[in-house]
């Protein structure tokens, strides 16, 4: 099974991805997490350090793929999760999406692509150009990380459009939204009313989730010394269980940008505004 995790930049995709990877490993699966971000920090929470990237390794080997061994690019992380960082070109030069393709090509040459029960792609921000949408070519499911805010849901809608486009030619489905660090879910619910899709989980607004990223530890590792965090781990285990059940998923019908902008902005501009009754509904009630 192959998963692709997307979402607005800074929303907590990598923290979420790492914890889902550990949750899948705790369910007995062999997991590989591939970081698809030039910052190459996707797997930091699993390994505790910035591992060398595939591009760094290929450059050292003068792009002789036959000279690269699995141990050169695959690093063991917490919970037995294997970790790879694609890396990227120098800032302002080259195409990061091309690097993702080279990463998959190398892993296939190493016969590593088919050795895992689950491969999870953690993908750069909300960039949905052809290059960074490449992981959707391989994925069975896409998961979108969001919060209860306007910008994150607007980005989620654009990603949903990419899923719909890729699903035309690939067996790809949207598994659902994951709400990260949010005290409310009312705007999320308003969005999924307009664009029907599952909500896998909504994680609570607790500081430990953010702190785990700084510490370079997953919530599961932190819970070993602080059992009060076990309840947070249960959210990730729930997501893992839902994914392993191979849900039907959806091919989303994204909302037009202007329509969504009006829908979400109206939620803020007119909070608690009573719904205008439908004249036909009023007539029906009178007849009854």
UniProtKB/Swiss-Prot annotation:
[4Fe-4S] cluster binds at residues 95, 129. Its cofactor is [4Fe-4S] cluster. InterPro entries: NifH/chlL_CS (IPR030655), NifH/frxC (IPR000392), P-loop_NTPase (IPR027417), Protochlorophyllide_ATP-bd (IPR005971). HAMAP family: ChlL_BchL. PANTHER family: LIGHT-INDEPENDENT PROTOCHLOROPHYLLIDE REDUCTASE IRON-SULFUR ATP-BINDING PROTEIN (PTHR42864:SF2). Belongs to the NifH/BchL/ChlL family. This is Light-independent protochlorophyllide reductase iron-sulfur ATP-binding protein. It comes from Nostoc sp. (strain PCC 7120 / SAG 25.82 / UTEX 2576).
